[in-house]
C-alpha cells in the first residue's frame, strides 16, 4: 500500500466559500482516478477538485466556516493528514455580488437605527461615531479573530462586536475623540426617535411603491375571477382528482404488462435450460473456427454430463450431431498440431484440447472412427522435422547465393558481411529459438502434462535432439572452417559449400570472430535448457574448433603484418640492452602484444562450458607452437631480407690498399647520423642486422616467452628454441658474408703491398720501423674496428677473430713461400709478424696463433740471439710509436 497523503502547503490560507485554493503536499494520488476524497474544513470539495500531479491539487472551498484541516483521501494511500489549516469566513454579500453558496435573502437589520432598511447599509455606510478615518490606517491584528471567535466588526451582522469595530477602525483614535464620537452617536439616535409622520416623510417613496403593488395585485385577482369564476379552487380540485385517476389507470396497465412479462420470462427460462444443448452443434463449430478450443472442451464435457444418459429421442439426436461435429474438430486439431511453424504454447493448447476430446469420445462408436495414437509425440516429431528442414533450407538459400555471387566478390564492400557470416547468424538464431522449443515440448511430454495413452519414448527423443544439434554443427563447420580439410565431412553429410575465389575467402576470414560470437550466443541459450552433456559436448567441440581456427587466422594475419615490418625499419639504434640493435624487434613485440590481446578477447578467453585449448599435448598447444614458429621465422626472414636486399641494391665499397692508389671508403660516424635510412651504408645495415640477430637470440626471444606466459599460455619452449636455432644459422650466414666482404679485400692487399717496389726478403734493407704492408694491415683493421664499434661493440670479437685468422693464414703462406731471408730481412719479418700478433692478441684464436707461429718458424735461417735482441728493440720502439693506433685492440669487453 502506498503512503498516506500529506498536505504540507496551501495558497491562499483563508477566504470565503468558493475560494480557489492550490493544495501542495506528498502522495496526493498517482492519477486522477486515485483521488476519491477531499475535505476542506469538513466540507466535501471533491467535485471541484482538479488533480494535477502527486504533489498538487486545485479545488474550490465549500460552505464551511472557521479553521479546519485539508484532508485528502486516495485509493492507494487511504485517508491522509494535514500540517496546514484553512480559515473559511462568510463575507457580507450585496445584491449585485456573485456568491458561491446560498445566502440569506432577508434584508439585513441596521442595528444602529433599530429597524430594517430598504437598501443595503453597506452601500451608504459611514462611520457611526462621526469621526474621520482618512488619516487612520486600518489594521486587523492576527489575533483579532482569536480574541472574538464568535463576533465581527460589521455593523449589519447580528454578532457585531463594538470592541472589534473600535480595534479595527479606530486603533489610533484618542480617548477624547472616542468620547466625542459617542456623544455624536447618542445625538444621532435621539434624532431618529420621531413620530410616525416623520417616518412617513422620510420613507414616502417606499410607501407609495407598496401601495402601487397592492393595487396591481387587486387588479390581477379581478381578472382571474372574470376568466374562471368564483370557484377557481373547485376547478383545481377537479384537475387533481383527474390526475389521480389517470395515474391509477397507468399503474394498473403497468402491473398487467409486468405479469405478462413474468409469465413470458418463466417460459423462456424453461426453454433456456435446454437451449445449451440445441445450440451446441453450431456453438462448437463457431468456437472452433475462433480457436477457442478450451470452451469447446468445456461445453462438450458439460453436455456429456447433463445429457449423456438421457433417453429422450430429440436429445439423443442432438448429441449425435454434436459427436460428429467434435469428430471433425478432432481432425482439424490434429492437422493444426503437426502444422509448423507455431509456438510451443499454441501447440500445447491444441494438444491438451485434442487429448481431452479424445478421452471424452473414447469407448464410443463415434470415437473409434478416428484414433490418434499420441498427438503430443506427433507434435514433437513434426517440430524436429521442421527444425531440420529449416536448417537445410537456410543452407541451400545461402549456398545458392554464394554460387551466384562469386563473380561479384571482387567488387564487394569490405564493410558488408559476407554471405557465410549471414548464414551463421541466421542459423544460430534458428537454433537458439527452435531447439529450446523442441526441448520444452519434450519436457512437457515426459513430465506427463501432454502424455498420451502410450508410454513415452525418451531414447527416440534424445536421438532427435542429438541429430538436430549434429546437423547444426555440420552446417556451421561447412560455413566457418573454410581453410580446413572437409573431405570427410562432405562424404559423411553429402553437403558442401561452394568453393569461392581467393578474394572471397580473404574477405571472409576477418569475420570468423563474429561467427564465433553467434555460435557462443546460441550455445549459451542451449546451456540454460539443462540439456544432457552428450548434446552440449557436440557444440562445445565445434566451438573449440572454431576458437582454434580463429586463433590460427589471427596469427596468420599477424604473420603477414610481420612480413611487412621491413618497410618500417628506420635503422634507429635505440635498444639499451644490446647496442647496435634497431627498433625493429620492439615493433615485433608491439605487434605480438596486439595479436595476443586480440586473441585473448576473441577466442582464447574461455566462456561457460568451453574447453581449455592449451592442455598439454593438445591440438591447441601444437597450433600455438606452430603459429609462433611461423611468426618468428617470418621476422627472421625480414631481417635477412633487409641485409641481403640491401646488398643487391648497393655496390659495397671495399677496403683496398692505399699503397696501390685506392683509398679506403669513408664511413659515417653513426647509422642515424646522416638523418635517414638513405644515408645508411651496406656495411652498417649488415652490422645492424647482425646485432638484431644476436639480440633476438640472447634477449628478445626469451622475453617473448615471458609475454606468452603472462597471457596465460604455457612457455612455448619449442617455438622459441626453433626460432633461436634459425636466428643462429642466419647470424652465421650473415657473419660469413660480412667477414668475406671485409676480410677478402684486406687480405688480398697484403701480398701486393709486401712486394711493392720490387721488394725482396733476401736483400739487405734498412730496418728500424714497420714495413708498409703491416702498417696498412693495422690501419685497415682499425677501420674495421671503428666501423663495428660505432654500431655494435658486441660484434667485434666474432668478426675480428675471423678476419685476424685469415690474415694470419695469409702471412703464414707468404712467409713459407720465401726461400731465404737476409740478415736484416729476417729481423724485419720477425718484427712485422710479432707486431700484428701481439697487437691483435685479444682477437687471436688458437688457429690464428698456430698460423702466426708457422709464419715465424718459416723465417729461414732462424734468428740468432743478436737478431732477436735487435728485433725486440725495434718492436718496442714501433709499439711506442703506434701505441695510440694499437690502443683500441687492447680494450677488453668494449
Swiss-Prot record:
Keywords: Exocytosis, Protein transport, Transport. GO terms for molecular function: small GTPase binding. SUPFAM superfamilies: E set domains. Coiled coil: none annotated. One of its GO terms (cellular component) is cell cortex. Residues 398-417 are annotated as: Disordered. GO terms for biological process: anterograde axonal protein transport; border follicle cell migration; branch fusion, open tracheal system; cellularization; endocytic recycling; exocytosis; Golgi to plasma membrane protein transport; Golgi to plasma membrane transport. It holds the Pfam family TIG. Gene3D superfamilies: Immunoglobulins. The keyword Transcription does not apply. It comes from the Eukaryota. Residues 5-89 form the IPT/TIG domain. Residues 398-413 have a biased composition (Basic and acidic residues). The exocyst complex is composed of Sec3/Exoc1, Sec5/Exoc2, Sec6/Exoc3, Sec8/Exoc4, Sec10/Exoc5, Sec15/Exoc6, Exo70/Exoc7 and Exo84/Exoc8. Component of the exocyst complex involved in the docking of exocytic vesicles with fusion sites on the plasma membrane. Belongs to the SEC5 family. This is Exocyst complex component 2.
